[in-house]
Structures are given as C-alpha cells and as structure tokens.
Amino acid sequence: MHYSEIMVRYGELSTKGKNRMRFINKLKRNIQSVLSIYPQVHVKADRDRTHIYLHGTDYQPVAESLKQIFGIQNFSPSYRVKKSVPALIEAVQTIMKQVYQEGMTFKITSKRSDHSFELDSRELNQTLGDAVFMAIPNVQVKMKAPDIELRVEIREEAAYISYETIRGAGGLPVGTSGKGMLMLSGGIDSPVAGYLALKRGVDIEAVHFASPPYTSPGALKKAQDLTRKLTKFGGNIQFIEVPFTDIQEEIKAKAPEAYLMTLTRRFMMRITDRIREERGAQVIINGESLGQVASQTIESMQAINAVTNTPVIRPVVTMDKLEIIEIAEKIDTFQISIQPFEDCCTIFAPDRPKTNPKIKNAEQYEARLDVEGLVERAVAGIMITEIRPQAETDEVDELIEGLL
C-alpha cells in the first residue's frame, strides 16, 4: 500500500476567529509554493484541515518539506481505500500487520462526512476493531494514548485510513503578520533572525549589501544560498542586492575610523528603510544580539536607529551566541554562514570601533557626506532576484563564473 494523501492540521489558526479562512488560504498558498517542485501534488484547504493529494509522488520528500512550513500543527499520511466495509476491513488488517509489535495497544477512531455510508461511526469502530482481533488475536485495546491509533474517514469520494501523526513547525503562516525587510549580512545571526520572523508569520524580503571588488561574487552567492535555505519555511523570497561600494569608500575617506561602523550601519538602515517604503513593508528585521560586537551595544543601536522611525525587530537580541548557533544548525544555515567570505560589515572594520557613539557626532561626520545623494543612488541601483525553494543552481553558478 502507498500513501495517497497527507492530512494537515492547523496550529494557532484555531484561535483566529473570523479571520480563520484568511489564515488557512495563506497557509494553502505557502504549501503550494514550497511543494511547487512536485507538479503532481494537489492542495485542497478546508476549514478544519488541508488535504494534500500525492497522485503518485513519493511521500517522504513531501513530508520533509511539510515539517518546515509554519502554521502546521501536525499532519498524517493516509491511504485511500474503496468506500466499502470489506475493503476497509482488508486495509485495516494489512496496516496493523505491518506496524504492530508484540505488546502494542490500539484504538479505532472513525469519522463520517458521508452520512449515507452503511455504518455509522460507532458501528464502524466496532466492525474494524473486530477485524483487527481476527488478524492479531492477542492485541489489546486502549482508549487513551494507545500505541497505534487507526483513524478512518469516510468522505464522499472514498475512505481514508491513517495511523501516524507527525509534528509540524507550529507558528503562523508566513505572510499573515505583515511584511518585513531582513538585513541579511551572510553571517550566522541574520538568517536565524529571518527564520524567527517567518515563524511568527512575517513575510520577509532579504536586503544584502554588496561592495565589489571588496566583497566577492562568492559572498553574494553565500547570501543567496542562505536566503534559499529560508524559502523552505514559507516559499519564495525576494533577494535585494544593494550596491554599497561608493558609500563605504566615502565614509572611509571622510569620517574618523572610530565611527566607520556606526556611519556604515546608519546608511544601511536608511537604505533598507527606503526600500521598505517602496516595497510596502512595515518593519525592518536584523540579527543584532546585544553586546556581541561593538556595533551591538545599546548606545550603538540607539545611534543607528536614530535615522528611522520604522520599527526594528531584533529576534535574537537577547540570545547567547551558542543559542543562535543551535538554531542555525537546526535550520541548516550554519555551514553556509561560516564560509570565509568577507561582507560589508567586515571589510573596513576599524581596530577600535566606538562602542558608545553619540548621535550628534555621527550627524556631524555625516555632514561631510552627500547622504541623500548616496542613498538615492544606492536605492536606484538595487537588483532584485526571486529565490525559490530549489532554484536553478546551475544558472547561479554560471552567473558567478561569468563574474569571475
């Protein structure tokens, strides 16, 4: 027997009242986006659950993808069976013989949406339970927390049987909590921040600052690969590459070394905010962790934040580095993040950066620069690429080779 569908149950969506169907429909679209690499798979969303029809597609890779999608509480692979008592008896006996081990307990739970079926739920439980006893005489029934719970659903088109319940990622469907711009450096922290924002339903676009020739094509590919890792949690992500060379050279030439990092981050924040406004997002997200580096003291955050009134979400701000690394390993971004490519935040990093910069000093040094002109030129020069769950990596590799 082969699985024919997967039944998906919702998590926090049960608390969403009148907005429930909006959340469910968004989850459906996210599932369709992530599973788009399986053309035979069909997704149908109902108020109480979503049905994923496999149509011959291998169950295992689909299940691995579903485990990552936010908004799913759990799911169960199911067998499609002819809607008749003899067919159900045969299927239940076959399944139990496959999964039963000595000493296990079981329970039958039946549900009918087709009330014209010849047996009601209670009668079906009894009939199928008797069939299990015939196949495995020594098996014991247990109504609470059995080792094996066979779930039987009688629908209009067929009957479905399942016995596994696999835990999902929980959280909220991506896109149900607004939209944010993720400042993605290529390090360990910012992809984790993006993941945690996705978990709470925030639709993200990744903003990456590139300063060629100081930053390499490898650094750009690294950031795109990190973005691709995040797509498995909610579908395609827009990757926004910002040209940053001119700005960094101007800062390096005209500002004191101690304030290089502060001014660099202030420009990044301004540019991200301008892109946010143009693309209809509500928040900025970054991977700052309090006290981890010189630019992540409270004083530095205050000086950098002063250039925007937009809310800045810092999902990892109170985490230790080891806590962040643990999540990075879980979401499979860690090995990419530690690849030895320099990013914009490291190429001109001063030996003794200011840990308690003053806003008035930052503004004084910025007066030496054409701030608005530099920001406008950077925003005008952005390049946007849609990153998919399994992008055509050959095309990306060809692009990198061309740049090299």
From Swiss-Prot:
Signal peptide: none
Keyword tRNA-binding found: yes
Main location group: cytoplasm
Domain THUMP: 60-165
Compartment list: Cytoplasm
InterPro entries: Rossmann-like_a/b/a_fold, ThiI_AANH, ThiI_fer, ThiI_N, THUMP_dom, THUMP_ThiI, tRNA_STrfase, tRNA_sulfurtransferase_ThiI
Residues reported to bind ATP: 183-184, 208-209, 265, 287, 296
Record GO terms (molecular function): ATP binding; CCA tRNA nucleotidyltransferase activity; tRNA binding; tRNA-uracil-4 sulfurtransferase activity
Keywords, sorted A to Z: ATP-binding, Cytoplasm, Nucleotide-binding, RNA-binding, Thiamine biosynthesis, Transferase, tRNA-binding
Enzyme Commission number(s) of this protein: 2.8.1.4
GO BP terms in the entry: thiamine biosynthetic process; thiamine diphosphate biosynthetic process; thiazole biosynthetic process; tRNA 4-thiouridine biosynthesis
Catalytic function, reaction form: [ThiI sulfur-carrier protein]-S-sulfanyl-L-cysteine + a uridine in tRNA + 2 reduced [2Fe-2S]-[ferredoxin] + ATP + H(+) = [ThiI sulfur-carrier protein]-L-cysteine + a 4-thiouridine in tRNA + 2 oxidized [2Fe-2S]-[ferredoxin] + AMP + diphosphate; [ThiS sulfur-carrier protein]-C-terminal Gly-Gly-AMP + S-sulfanyl-L-cysteinyl-[cysteine desulfurase] + AH2 = [ThiS sulfur-carrier protein]-C-terminal-Gly-aminoethanethioate + L-cysteinyl-[cysteine desulfurase] + A + AMP + 2 H(+)
Lineage: superkingdom: Bacteria
Function: Catalyzes the ATP-dependent transfer of a sulfur to tRNA to produce 4-thiouridine in position 8 of tRNAs, which functions as a near-UV photosensor. Also catalyzes the transfer of sulfur to the sulfur carrier protein ThiS, forming ThiS-thiocarboxylate. This is a step in the synthesis of thiazole, in the thiamine biosynthesis pathway. The sulfur is donated as persulfide by IscS.
HAMAP family: ThiI (MF_00021)
PANTHER family for this protein: TRNA SULFURTRANSFERASE
The protein's name: Probable tRNA sulfurtransferase
Species of origin: Streptococcus gordonii (strain Challis / ATCC 35105 / BCRC 15272 / CH1 / DL1 / V288)
Native organism taxonomy: Bacteria, Bacillati, Bacillota, Bacilli, Lactobacillales
